[in-house]
A protein has these predicted regions:
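Conserved mixed alpha/beta catalytic, RNA-binding, or beta-rich assembly cores of soluble enzyme
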Residues: 1-170, 178-197, 209-212
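C-terminal domain-closing interface element
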Residues: 201-220
Length: 220
């Protein structure tokens, strides 16, 4: 299971949101995996991801994270990932990973048909696919859909609802640009799964078409 499965938004937005990450299995391929994880990150870095990191050491958008040290510090049990915004670039990453033949599990979060097509064009068939079953329970306690679109871009939900609302308000008041607000939110995401380009686009659209209205009906 991957917590990046729960990303929310419309299809057009999600067509520009792909997370690729590496995972090892204890007792299977974890021992001695650190050099392979480092190579995975080097390959991803070549294609200019909009975010990259791992949950233990943070992401490239955090002030004290330096990319070379981040890669050098990878360990056998690290879960590292990168975010891309188009299928063409993702395909190039997948093709290079195939050539590298690292022998560890590679996962991609994205629209199922888009990921399937990416794998087909790269010359492979995906091993399996997983779905999010959605949100269960007291859904009336969830924030507005617009807020959830930002919050679920962090696999651990560390971009708080209140911070998101504050960033929206700062953009509305023109105290911050959409890009500045998106980068501020990304600092809270330790795993590096937050898509800053998508967040900037969402904020720009909200500025052009109308901002969050707290009186709207919340998540259905």
């Amino acid at each position: 299971m991957t917590n990046t499965l729960h990303r929310q938004g419309n299809r057009e937005d999600l067509k520009h949101d792909f997370v690729i990450f590496v995972h090892t299995a204890k007792g299977k391929n974890r021992e001695g995996a650190a050099p392979k994880i480092r190579e995975f990150m080097r390959i991803c870095l070549k294609y200019h991801p909009v975010n990259m990191g791992d949950v233990k050491r943070g992401s490239i958008h955090q002030d004290d994270v330096e990319i070379d040290r981040l890669i050098a510090g990878q360990e056998d049990n690290t879960v590292a990932g990168a975010v891309f915004t188009d299928m063409e670039t993702l395909q190039k990453v997948v093709e290079e990973l195939i050539r590298a033949d690292l022998g560890i599990c590679i996962n991609i979060t994205g629209l199922l048909d888009e990921v399937k097509e990416c794998c087909r064009k790269a010359g492979i068939t995906r091993h399996s696919a997983e779905h999010s079953l959605g949100v269960w329970g007291a859904k009336d306690r969830l924030p507005e859909r617009e807020v959830l679109e930002f919050n679920t871009m962090c696999g651990h939900g560390m971009v708080s609802f209140n911070l998101i609302r504050k960033m929206i308000e700062q953009v509305r008041l023109r105290r911050m640009t959409p890009k500045q607000a998106a980068l501020m939110m990304a600092k809270c995401c330790e795993c590096g799964a937050f898509n800053t380009t998508r967040a900037e686009a969402l904020l720009t659209r909200m500025r052009e078409r109308g901002f969050l209205d707290s009186s709207r009906t919340k998540h259905d």
